[in-house]
């Protein structure tokens, strides 16, 4: 599967809970996703509960007698975790992202990306990984594109459609090199997303390929 809407695979939540995600960019985006999504937060708490239970079963000073697959298999033995409602702030910037920007002394500066589109570059990793914001006006159709790498997209405000699937605040979409986006912003209001991109976007349109030199994406 090249794309999975709304939630990530469990491996992402396990790595987040264990503090073993691959980069600061992944840490920030997944933390923001968990902050905004009751379902994601509940999943992390379930996995933490499973891990804690299995750790208590491990003999002292011996290797852990279970693997990541064992954690997932043990899930059915535990009662479901109830997740209550969480008060949301009006601002579109989640605390996880705000804390990160404050720590690296970065402010959000919007730049023109195209008609009805603005971007704000936030962070670049040592391998060229980019964390950035996209702001799109209602009804805008984003040019069809693919990826020469991977991308995580988290909705902070508003909503968009990728093909027949809608993504709303707290939802996250993962795309790899096999995915092709056909994105349209909902008519109800502007949409702001946090994206983490590895590799450049891939366009078939030669004009967009030329414009890509100026966007840095």
Write out the residue ranges for each language-model feature.
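Positively biased amphipathic helices and basic secretion/translocation or surface-docking motifs
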Residues: 1-8, 24-28, 32-38, 42, ...
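Amphipathic alpha-helical interface segments
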Residues: 195-217
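Glycine- and acidic-residue-biased ligand/ion/polar-headgroup-sensing regions
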Residues: 137-140, 146-162, 169
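Charged, low-complexity intrinsically disordered boundary/linker segments
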Residues: 91-125, 129
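Conserved short histidine dyad/triad with adjacent acidic residue
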Residues: 115-147, 176-180
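Ligand-binding loop in jelly-roll beta-barrel domains
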Residues: 179-203
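Short acidic-glycine-tyrosine-enriched beta hairpin
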Residues: 162-182
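Short beta-strand His + acidic residue motifs that chelate non-heme Fe in jelly-roll/DSBH
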Residues: 142-144, 163, 181-187
């Amino acid at each position: 599967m090249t794309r999975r809407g709304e939630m990530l695979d469990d491996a992402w939540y396990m790595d987040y809970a264990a503090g073993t995600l691959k980069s600061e960019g992944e840490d920030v985006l997944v933390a923001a996703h968990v902050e905004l999504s009751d379902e994601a937060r509940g999943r992390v708490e379930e996995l933490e509960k499973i891990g804690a239970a299995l750790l208590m079963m491990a003999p002292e000073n011996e290797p852990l007698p279970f693997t990541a697959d064992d954690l997932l298999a043990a899930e059915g033995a535990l009662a479901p975790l109830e997740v209550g409602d969480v008060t949301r702030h009006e601002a579109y910037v989640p605390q996880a992202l705000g804390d990160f920007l404050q720590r690296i002394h970065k402010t959000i500066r919007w730049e023109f990306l195209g008609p009805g589109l603005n971007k704000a570059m936030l962070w670049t990793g040592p391998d060229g990984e980019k964390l950035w914001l996209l702001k799109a006006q209602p009804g805008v159709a984003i040019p069809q594109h693919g990826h020469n790498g991977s991308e995580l997209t988290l909705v902070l405000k508003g909503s968009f459609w990728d093909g027949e699937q809608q993504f709303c605040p707290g939802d996250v979409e993962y795309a790899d090199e096999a995915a092709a986006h056909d994105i349209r912003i909902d008519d109800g209001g502007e949409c702001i997303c946090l994206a983490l991109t590895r590799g450049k976007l891939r366009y078939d349109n030669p004009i967009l390929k030329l414009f890509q030199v100026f966007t840095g994406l």
